[in-house]
C-alpha cells in the first residue's frame, strides 16, 4: 500500500487525524510523524501536514525528495509570522503572547489556542468539543510547545518552494482566522506543481470540518 505520512499541527498529536485515518486506513499504510524535519520517510510517501505540520512536510520534500511522492498541505503557509513584505500572516506579538503563556500555564494556553482553530467555522461547536477532548487527556509538553513556536517564528520557506517539484494539493478553509487564505493562494501560485482546494464555511482545520470530503480528495489526488 502507498505510505501516507500524517503530521499534526502545533500542540496536537497524531490523534487529530483520526477521522481521516478511519476513512483511509484500508487503502494506505499510515505513518504518523512528529514535527522533526529529520524524520526518515518510507519511499514513495504521500506526506500530509497541517499548519506547522505542513511546513514540516515542505521541509521533508526539500530534504528527502526521493522519498516524497506527493504533498498535501492543510492550513499552510510558507511563513507564519508577518513581515513587511508578508502581511497575510500572524502578528509577531501574537506568537510572543503564546510563548509567554506556554511558560506560565501551558495547558490553559493550549486550550486558548485550540478555541481559535474553529472560529467562524460552520461546524464550530462540535469541532471545538472534539478538539477539547483531544487535549483533555494529555499534559502539555512545555519544551515541545516552545520549540514548535520557535519554528513558527523562524521558518521562512518562501525562497525554497520553487524547488518543491512534487505534485501538491493545497487545502485551506475559507474562514481560516489563524492563517489567511491568501497564504494558501500564494503557495498554489509559487509551487511548481500545485492545485488549491478551498473548503467553504471551514476555518483552520478543514479535514475535521469535512473529513469525508477531505479523504475523498486525498484519495483522488493519490491516484492522479
Segments predicted by a language model, with ranges:
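Conserved alpha/beta-hydrolase catalytic His-Asp/Glu region
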Residues: 104-155, 159-160
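Catalytic histidine-centered segment of alpha/beta-hydrolase-like enzymes
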Residues: 202-215
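Conserved alpha/beta-hydrolase "acid-adjacent" motif
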Residues: 177-183
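Flexible "cap/lid" loop of the alpha/beta hydrolase fold
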Residues: 62-63, 67-104, 144
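Conserved HGGG/HGGXW glycine-rich cap/lid loop of the alpha/beta-hydrolase fold
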Residues: 1-39
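Short beta-strand/loop motif that positions the catalytic acidic residue
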Residues: 164, 170-172, 176
Amino acid at each position: 500500500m502507498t505510505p501516507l505520512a500524517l503530521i499534526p499541527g502545533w500542540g496536537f498529536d497524531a490523534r487529530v487525524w483520526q477521522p481521516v485515518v478511519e476513512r483511509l486506513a484500508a487503502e494506505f499504510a499510515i505513518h504518523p510523524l512528529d514535527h522533526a524535519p529529520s524524520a526518515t520517510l518510507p519511499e514513495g510517501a504521500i506526506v500530509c501536514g497541517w499548519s506547522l505540520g505542513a511546513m514540516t512536510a515542505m521541509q521533508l520534500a526539500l530534504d528527502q525528495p526521493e522519498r516524497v511522492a506527493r504533498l498535501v498541505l492543510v492550513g499552510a503557509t510558507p511563513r507564519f509570522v508577518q513581515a513587511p513584505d508578508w502581511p497575510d500572516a500572524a502578528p509577531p506579538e501574537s506568537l510572543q503572547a503564546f510563548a509567554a503563556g506556554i511558560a506560565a500555564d501551558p495547558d490553559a494556553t493550549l486550550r486558548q489556542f485550540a478555541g481559535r482553530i474553529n472560529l467562524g467555522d460552520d461546524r464550530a461547536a462540535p469541532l471545538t468539543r472534539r478538539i477539547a477532548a483531544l487535549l483533555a487527556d494529555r499534559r502539555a509538553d512545555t519544551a515541545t510547545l516552545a520549540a514548535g513556536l520557535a519554528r513558527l517564528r523562524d521558518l521562512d520557506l518562501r525562497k525554497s518552494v520553487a524547488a518543491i517539484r512534487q505534485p501538491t494539493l493545497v487545502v485551506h478553509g475559507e474562514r481560516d482566522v489563524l492563517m489567511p487564505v491568501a497564504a494558501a493562494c500564494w503557495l498554489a501560485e509559487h509551487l511548481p506543481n500545485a492545485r488549491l482546494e478551498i473548503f467553504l464555511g471551514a476555518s483552520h482545520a478543514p479535514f475535521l470540518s469535512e473529513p469525508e470530503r477531505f479523504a475523498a480528495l486525498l484519495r483522488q489526488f493519490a491516484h492522479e
